[in-house]
Every structure is written in C-alpha cells, then in structure tokens.
C-alpha cells in the first residue's frame, strides 16, 4: 500500500502541469498587516529612453514577497528623495517608516548603467537630524553620517539590471534582518502541456518566476528535480527509456549523464551538502530503499534495508545523516539515519502521516507534509524540543522546498481547483501564492545561493 502511495505522491510532486508564457507572479495572501514598513523610493533616472528594468519596483516586490516588509506605495510617499541629504526624517517617522532606500541611475559611454544607492536609518537620522559628528583620522570633527547604513555604487549592463535589483534587495534584507537574502536564487520545476509535442518540460526561473527558461523537454514523464550545491547541475528522474532512470544535467551546457538505470524504480535524487555524493532511492532488491552514490566513483552504498519502504531522502546540513520517509511503523513517518554508524531514530509522532521532510539550513527545524483530520498541510517541527507547528491551511500540500536562507518554503497546493505553487514563511505568519494560468505547476526545487 505504501509503495503505491509513494508512487502516487511522486507523480503528484513532479508537476504534471502547464503554464502560460507570462511569468509566474507572487501574490501575498496573508501576513502583510504585521510586516515592517519600509520606503523604496523610485530611483532617479533622467535618461531619454526607458530603463530596461524598474529597479526600485523589483526591490520593493522582493522585500514584500519575503513577508517581513511592507513597502510604502509610491502614491503615499510624503517625498521622493534621490539622496540621503534630501530625506525629511520627520515625515517618514510620522508614517512609522524606520528604513528608506534611495538611489540614482545614470548611463555611461559604454551603454551600461551606473546605479548609486543608499540605505538610510530613519530613526537614527531623526535623532541626529543627519548631523552626528565624529573625529576624523587627522583629529577633525566631521559629519559621521551614521544614519546611512550603506552607500554603494555598481556598474551594470542592461541585460543584468533585474539580477542586480535582486542583489540590492538581498543587501537590504541582510542589513535589516541579520539574515542573508534569497532573492538572487532560482526555482526548478516540472511542467506538462498536453498540447505540446513534448508535453513534459523541466524549467528554471528566477525565484519570482521571471526569466523562465526551458531546460529539458520530453515525451515521457520527468520528475524530482534537485539542485547541486553550486547551482550548476540538476539531478532528475526521466522515463524516456520506458522506466524511471536518474540523470544529471548541467543547466548551462546542457550536457546530460545517466546515473542509474536499475530494474524497477530509480528515484528521489538529492545532492549532499558538499556535492560529492547523491542520495537516491532504488527498488532493485525488492522494496524501496535509500542508497548513497559517490559521484566520482559511482559506488553505491545501501543506507536502509528490510521489508519496509524507505524513500524521500534529504541530507542533514552537516552531511553526516539523512532523513527519509518510511512505513516501517505502519504508516509513513520521517526517520533519521546516521551514515557512519547506521543508527536510526524516528523524528515525527504527531499526525497520522508525515512525508517529504526537509531540514532548514541551520539544522534546527524539520519541514514536512503532515496529515491530520484537516488534510495534508505543511508543518514545522523543532528538532530539539519536538514541538510542531502547522504552517499552512491550503489544500493538498506537497513537495516542500526550503529557501537557502531558511526564511521561506515553496510548495505545491490546490487553489480554486487548480494546482499552484505557494510560499509560506518559516514561522507561518506570511503566505504568498504563485498563480498559474490554464494549468498546474508543481514539484518546486529552490536553488542554493547563486
């Protein structure tokens, strides 16, 4: 029974779906009222032609989508300063804004764009009115401008304007939260378009759905994309030869390599944190079992054994253990196995089933699909205390994938009878949805930092 359930879940998780040519668009659905107000002032541009990207709009959208910030709409801004010297601290303080990003864009002789930008601490500026002073190296009393959190300049080609906007959002996010931003990342997913001669498609896009690119198309199912730690390779499952086989593909060169083609099932590939080993699931000896493969030698090591079905391996961030889903207790639950000694322990006890587990990059939390009376929902479990929190109220949640900074989780769910990708913050307070038009998009895999 569990074997059939695993196969069904794998099919659900692959993303048998289609999407419109337009980019996926994130829509905040919950938690915006408690987000932190911030001002992303439109960057000054006096060129004769239109900019290739609205940099400030991309930054504002990124920060809003994190769920932690609520950018002030341009129409409600009391002023639009283009440098920190023009900021009226009192006007922004009265709106509850404590941070402001401002900047200018010019074009150089080579056609590239010079972006100058500053992040301003409004609270500090209000206290000092921008007149805080400090001793210089030669003993002179000079303006310290300690209300300016950072002041940066970059020269960017037109083709990379949107990419650099994500970079600025990362810098703002890290400065204000102390955590690394994950806006300059990608997602991989599987799409199906029944009207296409090659209906099964593996695609990648920026985390927000822009710059979507077709990586691979096939007449047979594609499943379970997984990123290498360097962000250059995807492992995935293909049925192009009539059975499940595991492949590895460089997303830049397109070079593909078959890794396994054992009888019956080959699936659920997952790179180790150092990229040297692949965890995978094979059924060549009967039931589904977890293995590891040394990618240099192709040597296989069996990790689990016995009469139970064991699947969905995921590496602990330290690379010393794996978590996996097993029916050894009767119903699917999540276990952890030490790779050096083989000791195995059960991690999940709440809910009739727990599947698709992933561990946050800091090793503190387990995120999984929990089945209870309310259905299949994402849940988070504290690995030290065992305390569990239901993160979502969406329908038929599956395939969670954690952002590399651990701040958000992307997953598949049902909305208005359609399959969509959704996001939830790791604390469950903020939720967003990536609606798909005329189809379904599933099996997201969030890339590492790029």
UniProtKB/Swiss-Prot annotation:
Q: Which NCBIfam families match?
A: propeller_TolB (TIGR02800)
The source organism is: Vibrio cholerae serotype O1 (strain ATCC 39315 / El Tor Inaba N16961)
Summarize the protein's role. Answer: Part of the Tol-Pal system, which plays a role in outer membrane invagination during cell division and is important for maintaining outer membrane integrity.
Pfam families in UniProt: PD40, TolB_N
The protein's matches in SUPFAM superfamilies, at most eight in alphabetical order, are given as: TolB, N-terminal domain, Tricorn protease N-terminal domain
User: From which domain of life does this come?
Assistant: Bacteria
**Subunit organization:** The Tol-Pal system is composed of five core proteins: the inner membrane proteins TolA, TolQ and TolR, the periplasmic protein TolB and the outer membrane protein Pal. They form a network linking the inner and outer membranes and the peptidoglycan layer.
Name of the encoding gene: tolB
Regarding protein family, the annotation reads: Belongs to the TolB family.
Record-linked InterPro entries = 6-blade_b-propeller_TolB-like, PD40, Tol-Pal_TolB, TolB_N
- Signal sequence interval, chain numbering: 1-22
Q: Give GO cellular component annotations, separated by semicolons.
A: periplasmic space
In Gene Ontology terms, what is a biological process of this protein? protein import
Quote the subcellular location field of this record. Periplasm
Q: What is this protein called?
A: Tol-Pal system protein TolB
Q: Which UniProt keywords apply?
A: Cell cycle, Cell division, Periplasm, Signal
